[in-house]
Amino acid sequence: MAVDNEKKRSTPDSLNSPHAKKSKPMQELSESGPLTQADVVYFQKEAIWRQMIQYKQQMMSMRSELIRLQRESDASKHIVTVLTAWYEQILALFDELNSEETSDLLLAITKNDDEQLDLIRKKLSNLISSKVTFDSAKYEKVSGELALLSRQNEQMTEEKRSLGERIDELESKITELAKEHERAQSKTLKRLDSQRHIKTEEDEQSTTKEENPQPNGHHKENDKTAVVDSEELDNLKCELDKLKTANQLLVQQVEQLTKENQSLIQKSLNLENKLHNLEESDLEDNTYYKKIVKNNQSLQEQIGKLTKLNSSNVSRLNELERQQNDLKSVIEGEIIEENEKLKQQLQESENNLVRIRTTRDELLSKNNILTSQLQDQKTNESLVELNNVLSKRVESLTEERLEAIVGTPGTGKLEDLSQQELIHKISQLNNEIKEVELAFKQTREITLKKLTSSIDQENLTKKLTIEKNKADQKYFSAMRVKDSLTNENKLLKAQIAKSQDLIKNLNDLEKKYLNKIDLLSNQLVDFRIIKENSLAENSKLHDELKTLNIAQDALHQEVERVNAKLESTLKEHTDLQESNKKRELELAKLQKQLQSTENILQKYKTNNTNSLLQEDEQQLEALRSIAKCSVCSKNWKDTAITVCGHVFCSKCTQERLAARLRRCPSCNRGFSANDLLSIHL
């Protein structure tokens, strides 16, 4: 990535420069001679390139791991969706929860709290256990298989963990080998190694030349070097003695370990024999076995007591239900009889009422007809009397008028009168008669009008009186009916009160019986809970026994593992013996190497010329210039600038960033904090 960035950033410079096609400086290693500054820069760039390749490999491995994890997460999401659909189908089949509860029970993919999952698991297990029938034989079989599978799962997890650790170790070894391989392929390191070999060969050649016989003048110098070499030889012999003593100690430790191993093997064999041939005495001494036996006995006693109580409670409940059914049948029969009697009485009273009403209406109609006839007769008589009175009054009025006009009639007066006077009086009488007739007609019309109005009023009064009589009769009949109904209502209320008292008494009895039934049902529930608890404890004890058996099997397997480990330790012991032999051989080789080194030291001390020292100092300074910072010349180079490839210490780069001098000290190229890369030379 740094090289790509360098290429991208160098494009505008390369376009503007006239010599763009030329190779970049400091990218070729010198083949011969001492190391130059260009070789140092090449070495730095090569180290940065190796580090970048390592980062790239890590990134590729992380990317492949991320793709694998994404696939696994997609598969797990698919499985979770399928399981949620199954749970929805199960809940729909059971149909015992509301929609809110089912939404709480369904799994959420975003969050997976262990407590919430345990609650959901318990709810679903209760639902499924309420619907699914329990088979003890299948349960025992499945529980045994589950225990075996759990044990196998634990073994597999342990093996997986150990394999994972081995894989991590192998990955670390592979990375180290890859680093060593890359370092072995680097040109600079090959160059340095070749220079070292050349120097050693030159030193050996010089020592062989100087080993030839010299004149007596150099005898004193050889004596001095021999004294120094003898001192170094003594030191090396002391170190050899130390190594021998350490080797003897290691041999003694190995012998002790073998003895302990043999004793452990014997103990393990004895324990294995005991485990295969367990006796009752061994189990009786065990506290867990005693507890299990005591718990089993107490549970059996509790189960016997609970069965007796359950049978007695069932018999009592049956008796109470029978008594309750008898009482209900008796009360229902009495209530039905009373209702039938009341219905008969109501029908008879209704029939009597209808009959009385019909007779009453007939009598009222007859009475009205008779009263109307009597009133008509009275009106006719009164009219006749009025007519007579009026005729008499008219006659009296005519006579009075004639007397006033003519006077009392007499023959002498009429005779004395002349004809004209008689005609005149007759005309006056005719006029008066006409006026009297008009007045009579008017009075007759007025009287007739008054008569008609009086007749109408009388008819209205008659109608009103008739209607009043009818209303009075209806009122009185209604009052009579009301009195009869009130009496009947009182009787019915008294009967209803009696029936209500009976119903209250029956309700009280029913409440008492229901309370007793509730108490008995609660006791039954408690007994069932106790029974379930006892069964659960019994199953737990069975499970504990199974777990003990499983533990026994696990112990057998552990014994087998211990035997396998013992075999492996024996193999390791043999390997250690072989390694000790190899070390002894290596010690012999080291002794030979010591002798050769002593000879080399003597030769080197005799031929320690100034020229070789100067060359060594130059090489050391060159290596120091490679490894130490060129700015401060104190700290080791550990950070590289990815823009230009130059390497400095982290302190100098951080000081430059803090002082805002963000340019490379060697090439004056700009950089930022993101362009820094930590390396190890």
Swiss-Prot record:
GO CC term (a single one): nucleus
Protein name, entry field: E3 ubiquitin-protein ligase BRE1
Coiled-coil residue spans: 50-77, 136-190, 224-446, 477-628
Membrane is among the record's keywords: no
Family: Belongs to the BRE1 family.
Region spans: Disordered: 1-32, 180-226
Lineage: Eukaryota, Fungi, Dikarya, Ascomycota, Saccharomycotina
Pfam family of the protein (one): BRE1
Chain's role: E3 ubiquitin-protein ligase that mediates monoubiquitination of histone H2B to form H2BK123ub1. H2BK123ub1 gives a specific tag for epigenetic transcriptional activation and is also a prerequisite for H3K4me and H3K79me formation.
UniProt keywords, alphabetically: Chromatin regulator, Coiled coil, Metal-binding, Nucleus, Transferase, Ubl conjugation pathway, Zinc, Zinc-finger
GO biological process, one term: filamentous growth of a population of unicellular organisms in response to biotic stimulus
RING-type ZnF: 629-668
Location (main, coarse): nucleus
One Gene Ontology MF term: histone H2B C-terminal K residue ubiquitin ligase activity
SUPFAM superfamilies the UniProt entry points to: RING/U-box
Pathway terms, separated by semicolons: Protein modification; protein ubiquitination
Cellular localisation: Nucleus
Residue spans of biased composition, Basic and acidic residues class: 1-11
PANTHER family in UniProt: E3 UBIQUITIN-PROTEIN LIGASE BRE1, RING FINGER PROTEIN-RELATED
Catalysed reactions, as listed in the record: S-ubiquitinyl-[E2 ubiquitin-conjugating enzyme]-L-cysteine + [acceptor protein]-L-lysine = [E2 ubiquitin-conjugating enzyme]-L-cysteine + N(6)-ubiquitinyl-[acceptor protein]-L-lysine
UniProt-listed Enzyme Commission number(s): 2.3.2.27
Enzyme class: transferase
